[in-house]
Amino acid sequence: MKSIKYLSEQIHEELEDAEKYAKAALYNKHLDSELSRVYAELSRQELAHSDMLHNQAVRLIKAEREKGVEPPASMQAVWDWQHEKMIDHVAKIKMLLSGL
């Protein structure tokens, strides 16, 4: 399940970048609308990347369960906590992008 940990870290990085680009888009909204649109698109792409990585984490967890391998309770608790943080982060980024 090391790959789940690595995917979780990558998802976090993608979301951090998405937030950074969303904030840059908002900052440039009235200064340079074309640049603002570019930053908004970059943010959306980072969100798409995080979604693709998330789908892979879910797929790997499901595949392990289908083999009869259940993650330890502590690992599941960490994943659940990380997953909740990811959902909150995505919501924050989408809120930023909605201000454009």
Residue ranges and their predicted role:
Residues 1-100:
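Non-heme di-metal
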